């Protein structure tokens, strides 16, 4: 979740939101102007470069929920190498997650761990992976609720969740295919007039 030559706090924060909290982050507007960010000149750190987002109302809404998380991972550059500085400037990796402020990546980890959406999202992700997904709430809602409750009761222990999933009916039964809609069936049949003319 980085660009080809540099890290991307925005992409990293977006990945954390979507993969671990199951919160969809909207794509940027089609007319967004990236030039202000790309032409940041001699601004030394990503934190300073990304300040441009806060001045644009069409960008600020989403970047406020991605950038603070991603900036906490800035001690890993675009290739994943550990670093203490960027362009000679010591990195500030403090951040915020939904009102929880922290000083470093360990604080981010704790904030993610305690987030109210993490548990249900992990259950959803593992259930979808284990059953071949995607999750369909009209069929899977009750099962997901049960697994989420059990996961909490067991102290959020991942091995126990995996065991429950593997022993569930979702792994031992196959959902029958749905009957095709009437319009689809009729569309597959040739008109009676065509059948009659073919038979002559």
PLM feature spans:
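Sequence context surrounding c-type heme c attachment/ligation sites in exported
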Residues: 1-105, 109-113, 117-119, 138, ...
């Amino acid at each position: 979740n980085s660009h080809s030559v540099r890290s991307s706090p925005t992409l990293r924060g977006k990945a954390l939101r979507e993969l671990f909290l199951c919160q969809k982050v909207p794509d940027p507007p089609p007319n967004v102007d990236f030039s202000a960010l790309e032409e940041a000149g001699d601004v030394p750190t990503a934190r300073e470069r990304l300040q441009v987002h806060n001045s644009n109302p069409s960008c600020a809404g989403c970047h406020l929920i991605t950038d603070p998380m991603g900036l906490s991972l800035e001690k890993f550059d675009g290739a994943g190498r550990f670093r203490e500085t960027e362009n000679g400037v010591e990195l500030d990796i403090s951040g915020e997650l939904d009102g929880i402020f922290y000083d470093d990546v360990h604080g981010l980890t704790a904030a993610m761990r305690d987030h109210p959406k993490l548990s249900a999202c992990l259950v959803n992700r593992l259930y979808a992976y284990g059953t071949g997904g995607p999750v369909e709430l009209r069929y899977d809602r009750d099962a997901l609720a049960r697994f989420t409750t059990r996961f909490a009761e067991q102290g959020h222990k991942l091995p126990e969740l995996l065991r429950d999933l593997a022993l569930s009916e979702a792994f031992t039964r196959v959902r029958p295919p749905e009957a095709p809609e009437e319009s689809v069936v009729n569309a597959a049949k040739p008109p009676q007039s065509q059948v009659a003319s073919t038979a002559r």
